[in-house]
Amino acid sequence: MLGRFVANGRIYEGSFEIDGELLVFDGYEVPLTAVKFLPPVVPSKIIAVGLNYIDHAEELNMPVPEEPILFMKPSTAVIGHDDCIILPQISQRVDYEGELAVVIAEDCRNVPETNAADYILGYTCFNDVTARDLQAKDGQWTRAKSFDTFAPLGPYIAEIDDPSKLGIQTRVNGKVVQKSNTSNLIFDVFQLVSFVSSVMTLKAGDVIATGTPAGVGMLKDGDVVEVEIEKIGILRNTAVKIDRQIRCEC
């Protein structure tokens, strides 16, 4: 695993292992209960992909896109594991969207699909939080996708040889609301790295969010949302209304 975390009042960054209830880092063992995971990277940009699961396209009764549909989320929206998703007053419907995220290893441009794996640092969980009513109102996605706290990322980066058959599910208050597999991606991870890098330079630490499966839905004040991906782990966040509590410990 790769990532950033706080333990004993200090910030650590690098490679570590999780052994049961312990985090093992540079020869030291720290109870996971004493660890606060930070966002594993601070990307220069987040490139997200719309309508990239077959089951999600079927759910919306929309045709499969001929090429990836790209949009951006700002790095200022990033939060980590156990941080709070702030539900803005201006929106009456904020949705979860559990996703697999690809973390770029080094600066790259025009990467061939066959070489894409060489430029991937690893994979992590992502939640493409969206103010759905604003998305519909605006007719484009920037405002709806860009509020602070609307890009939960983590808890850490896993190095995975084959990301093509990973189980993915999202839970709200313990109830499974999304369940799929990355084998249902319309454009796979390597296709996405190649396509995105043909459009823009990818910087080390940049994130490509690969799209969400069927089952997106609304978050309410106090909801606990978890995105779990096979071979990676669980990203957990709590939704909080901004008029109730601006800063929270959760």
From Swiss-Prot:
Q: Which InterPro entries match?
A: FAH, Fumarylacetoacetase-like_C, Fumarylacetoacetase_C_sf
- Report what the protein is called: Uncharacterized protein AF_2225
Question: Which organism is the protein's source?
Answer: Archaeoglobus fulgidus (strain ATCC 49558 / DSM 4304 / JCM 9628 / NBRC 100126 / VC-16)
The domain of life for this entry's organism is Archaea
Sites binding a divalent metal cation sit at: E97, E99, D128
Question: Which UniProt keywords are listed?
Answer: Metal-binding
Q: Which family does it belong to?
A: Belongs to the FAH family.
GO terms (BP aspect): small molecule metabolic process
A molecular function GO annotation: metal ion binding
Spell out the SUPFAM superfamilies in the cross-references: FAH (SSF56529)
